[in-house]
Amino acid sequence: MSLHEPEAQPSLKKRRRDSFSNADPKRVKRLHSGTQRLHYHDIGPSVNELKTRIRDVKRLLAKRIDDLPADVRVAKERELAECQRDLEKAEVKKQRSKMIQKYHFVRFLERKRATKELKRLKGQLHKLENDDRLDPNARENSIETLNRKISASEIDLNYTIYSPLTEKYISLYPNERRKQQPMEPEESNVIRTNSGEKPPLWYTVKQSMADGTLELLRDGKLGIGLSGEKKDSNNADVSLKSNTMSLLVHRKQKKPKSKIKVDGDEDAKRSSARSVQEGTRNENKRTSKEDVQGEDDDAESESDGGFFE
């Protein structure tokens, strides 16, 4: 190699790789996962964290309720009630995301079908309105029929979009076409009807279209269930209050020390009954052995000689 020959320059790919050589890929991955965890915790505590906190507060109230000061006890009871409310919200949110993932594919297919049907009906209506060859009375009747079908098709489309995400999705279309085709895995959990009747939530969507509450219906803020009627929310509030105060009631209902004596008497009664049962069992065994021995003696006396005698 001569002295005047220039040194080989590293390639662009090599230079680019060397410029990031100080960054460890594992370290970068750890940093990204850490930011994701921080972002997740910014949203709110998870279901498991809330359950752990509720369990800890319940244990504290159950064990040290007589030793805690009044203000601390009240603060812990409020914290318990808040954690239970947060847990209920977190479970609803988790169930909502689960139902969205479960019925997303079927909603997509039926939304495409409803959109296609609505477009076809509107095309027929446009042609019918511009056709002057038909009788006016017949054309009016046909237009009225098409308008009813278009209205129903619009409700079908809104049903596929705004049906409550927290509830099971009932299919709009009957099962006739799917008898000949294999069912997709995503469609196995969908409730279908062979009669073609509209599900109960279809009429709720129709009413929400008139009221302008489709967004609230989809997010489950109207409290509408699968039957198309409002759910009973009073039971949830009662359960929260009962869970919060059950510890205090359980603690106050403790019996005095006389209960221990009663338990001891019951244990003595059980042990005496057990001993009586064992005695009778032993006597039965003795009598059975004596009977068997007597039968064997009789058999030996009556024996007239066998193969080994």
Curated annotation (Swiss-Prot):
Task: Point to the regions of Basic residues compositional bias.
Answer: 249-259
Region Disordered, as annotated, extends over 1-37, 176-196, 244-309
Report keywords, A-Z: Coiled coil, Nucleus, rRNA processing
Where does it sit, as one GO cellular component term?
preribosome, small subunit precursor
Q: Which residues form a coiled coil?
A: 70-134
List, alphabetically, the InterPro entries matched: Efg1, EFG1_rRNA-proc
Where found? Nucleus, Nucleolus
Superkingdom, natural source: Eukaryota
The record's family statement is:
Belongs to the EFG1 family.
Job of this protein: Involved in rRNA processing.
Q: Which GO terms describe its biological process?
A: maturation of SSU-rRNA from tricistronic rRNA transcript (SSU-rRNA, 5.8S rRNA, LSU-rRNA)
User: What name does UniProt use for this protein?
Assistant: rRNA-processing protein EFG1
> Which portions of the chain have biased composition (kind: Acidic residues)?
293-303
* Primary location: nucleus
User: Which portions of the chain have biased composition (kind: Basic and acidic residues)?
Assistant: 260-270, 280-292
